[in-house]
Regions:
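Catalytic cores of nucleotide-sugar-dependent glycosyltransferases that transfer UDP/GDP/TDP-activated
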Residues: 1-591
């Protein structure tokens, strides 16, 4: 072959080589773009499912066919009739009892006439009478949070979850909240301003308030908006201001003034944390003889760490007697005797005190050394009740979860494998990985996180691991469904409720580090321990991560039995948590 031909052939080969390289680069680029597009489509699918669920929830609310929503709205209309002097307190009380009657289908009768004016609606109410009252309790929450309207911590989930569970069991529940500027009003159905002001005492004078009413998840909600002290709740944050005592004592006093003005006679006034604890002494010293003789007070503490200590003279702002209350057996702080303790007021003046904790017993809470209320809790120990939080089983159920590529249940676990594959693909994990582990921390700072991570890295070195430090609602469902093991900072998780949801979705909850794992030993099996704490102690508390992994790999029958058993347990709001509260309501009504 001639040199020219060789040179030409070499040029052709080099050209073909460059073209092949370009084709390979192009194909790689197309593959990357295709993968990115696939990931984008998957993210959009999850987002779309979330949006569909929101639209369906909104549609359900807007149809106004839910019996709880209609009953709640009807109660709020009755309140408005009292405030505008259309009816008296006695007749309003009779109407409320009528709504609580289990033998009457309020929703069916009134669903088509709720649009009528108050005068027309009153005529229908007066015709709709003569029935007997059912045995349920009428509970009014005076609180500072309620999901999803205003949510900062565990209180919001608790108020909504417990209220819905109580209504499903035949009790009548209402909520009173401040009208914050930051309210999520899109979640409030039928929001309306009541065309009447009511006045409340504060700082030596009567001040006007505007009332707004609406329905959230079938629960009647009243929002109190101060007119003169309008800056109290027009701020960016809910808590954390130097005048928080003034803000929430005003709201507490206004709530009681409103209850009396509207002619309400609830069985239980349910107050929460220190922010509404001042309701206790206000009720017994000022309001009990204003038509509320049959009402009792329940306090729930999400935590004993936040208490609010103030100068005694500030009690006079809402109409209390500082001299009479600044005593060791009343509001005087146990450590700073020159101050009063607002949370202590709630403990002393409530008929029952619910302390929310998944794992601790009453004795352990009383003997704790961090909150300073030990003497007070010891004196009032017969009032104390410990209740574990629940979770929303309708939103967190793998058998109907719309976020999952395939549903599954304890009776049929096939769908969990499909969820695992989907999660592996979403996070770029190897599809042949048999175990997926997650640390689901949420968006805030978690105490002890660095120590926990160090422990985890020492115990498990695996590239098929992902740490999710930011909470994503849609991804959370897929994480639970696709995981075999969920690493939890604590079993006392009242915000994200990871241990509860993990068991529901067939993932084993394991404590993150050895220090937390040892804490399981303090869950003594006395009569005060909850069913949840006993179950967790027996099945999960003392299992290290290495043992869980070994059991999953080498003893699948034992693993499957334990997982399926956990999935069948009911730790929702409707179960143990609700039952404990109903028992507490019954106990204080018999006092």
């Amino acid at each position: 072959m001639r040199s020219g031909e060789l040179e030409e052939k070499g040029t052709d080969i080099w050209k073909l080589f460059r073209e092949a390289q370009q084709n390979i680069l192009y194909l790689n680029k197309q593959r990357i773009m295709a993968k990115e597009e696939l990931d984008r489509v998957k993210r959009e699918k999850i987002s779309l499912l979330d949006r569909i669920e929101q639209l369906e929830r909104t549609k359900l609310i807007n149809t106004r066919k839910d019996k709880f929503s209609i009953s709640a709205e009807l109660l709020l209309r009755i309140d408005a009739m009292v405030l505008t002097s259309l009816i008296g307190s006695k007749e309003a009380s009779e109407f409320r009892r009528l709504i609580m009657d289990s033998n009457v289908s309020i929703a069916d009768y009134f669903s088509e006439i709720m649009h009528k004016q108050d005068t027309e609606l009153l005529v229908e109410l007066r015709h709709f009478s003569g029935k007997s009252r059912k045995s349920g309790y009428h509970v009014i929450h005076v609180c500072t949070e309620m999901a999803p309207v205003v949510s900062v911590g565990s209180l919001a989930l608790y108020v909504t979850g417990l209220s819905r569970a109580l209504q499903r069991k035949g009790h009548l529940v209402e909520v009173i909240l401040p009208k914050y500027a930051s309210l999520n009003l899109n979640e409030v159905h039928g929001l309306r301003e009541v065309d009447a002001e009511f006045h409340s005492y504060f700082n030596g004078q009567l001040h006007g308030n505007r009332i707004w009413t609406g329905v959230v998840y079938g629960i009647g909600v009243t929002f109190i908006e101060p007119l003169y002290y309008s800056s109290f709740f027009s701020r960016e944050n809910i808590y954390g201001y130097s005048n928080d005592f003034e803000r929430f004592s005003y709201f507490s006093r206004a709530s009681l003034d409103y209850i009396v003005k509207a002619g309400k006679q609830p069985d239980v006034l349910h107050i929460h944390n220190w922010e509404t604890s001042i309701v206790g002494p206000l009720f017994w010293d000022v309001f009990v003889n204003q038509g509320l003789e049959g009402t009792r007070i329940m306090l729930t503490c999400q935590s004993l760490e936040s208490q609010c200590v103030e100068q005694p003279e500030k009690l006079a702002l809402c109409g209390l007697d500082p001299h009479g209350l600044h005593r060791s057996d009343r509001l005087q702080d146990n450590h700073k005797s020159h101050l009063v303790n607002v949370l202590k007021a709630g403990v002393v003046y409530s008929n029952k005190v619910i302390i929310m904790s998944s794992m601790q017993t009453k004795g352990q809470i009383i003997n704790a050394t961090i909150h300073g209320l030990e003497p007070t809790l010891t004196i009032h120990k017969d009032k104390l009740v410990v209740a574990p939080p629940g979770f929303d089983s309708s939103a967190w159920d793998p058998s109907v979860d719309k976020f999952l590529p395939q549903n599954y249940s304890a009776d049929n676990m096939k769908g969990k494998s499909a969820c695992k594959v989907s999660l592996q693909q979403h996070l770029g994990l190897q599809e042949q990985a048999s175990i997926i582990l997650f640390v689901f921390m949420g968006s805030g700072q978690t105490p002890g996180l660095n120590t926990a991570m160090e422990y985890f890295e020492e115990e498990l070195k695996d590239e098929n691991t992902r740490f999710l430090n930011k909470y994503d609602e849609a991804l959370a469902h897929l994480v639970l469904a696709g995981s075999d093991i969920m690493l939890c900072p604590s079993f006392d998780d009242t915000v994200l409720q990871v241990p509860l949801k993990a068991m529901r979705y067939g993932a084993m909850p394991i404590l993150l580090n050895s220090t937390d794992r040892k804490s399981g030993h303090f869950v003594d099996r006395d009569l005060e321990g909850s069913k949840f704490s006993g179950y967790v102690k027996d099945n999960f508390t003392n299992i290290p991560l290495s043992q869980a992994i070994d059991e999953l790999k080498n003893n699948p029958s034992k693993w499957d039995k334990k997982i399926v058993d956990a999935m069948t347990k009911d730790f929702s709001w409707d179960a143990e948590c609700c039952d404990i509260h109903i028992s507490a309501y019954a106990a204080i009504k018999n006092l």
